[in-house]
């Protein structure tokens, strides 16, 4: 399980170092194999351990591709999906098209989302968090039925 937000850097070759606390799980359960793709709703990337990605891939492939919305989702998420492997230094390479999509420069945030990570540019991450916090503080936060039952 991946939790927490980590400030990381993108090196000159387009690689990021996965924080040490996550590496053992990725290596033991996925042989260091991961898949990175775009988030269709946010200017960030989604980084999945291979086994988690395979579950997502099954769900995507089960969608009827005659439905234009389904087809668009498949095209974007599967089209950008790129396999990456942890190297001996715990780094993965983020492809150029993925870096461009998420506007990644040197300073990044790697954000654990339990079964996957989000990769954000530092500026986009902080702007998104400000927006999320403002929504929560506004009192206009629309709660779904599931959220109404959630106790934190």
Swiss-Prot record:
Highest taxon of the lineage: Bacteria
Localization annotation: Cytoplasm, Nucleoid
Residue ranges constituting the SpoVT-AbrB domain according to the UniProt record: 5-52, 81-124
GO biological process, alphabetically ordered: negative regulation of DNA-templated transcription initiation
Chief place of localization: cytoplasm
Description of how the protein assembles with itself and partners: Forms oligomers.
Protein name: Transcriptional regulator MraZ
Name of the gene encoding the protein in the UniProt record: mraZ
């Amino acid at each position: 399980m991946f939790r927490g937000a980590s400030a990381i850097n993108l090196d000159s070759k387009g690689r990021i170092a996965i924080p040490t606390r996550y590496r053992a799980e990725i290596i033991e359960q996925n042989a260091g194999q991961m898949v990175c793709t775009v988030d269709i709703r946010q200017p960030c990337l989604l980084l999945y351990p291979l086994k988690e990605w395979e579950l997502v891939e099954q769900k995507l492939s089960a969608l009827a591709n005659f439905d234009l919305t389904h087809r668009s989702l498949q095209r974007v998420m599967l089209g950008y999906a790129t396999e990456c492997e942890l190297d001996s230094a715990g780094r993965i390479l983020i492809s150029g098209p993925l870096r461009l999509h998420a506007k990644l420069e040197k300073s990044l945030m790697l954000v654990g989302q339990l079964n996957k990570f989000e990769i954000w540019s530092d500026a986009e991450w902080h702007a998104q968090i400000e927006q999320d916090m403002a929504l929560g503080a506004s009192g206009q936060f629309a709660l779904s039925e599931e959220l109404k039952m959630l106790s934190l």
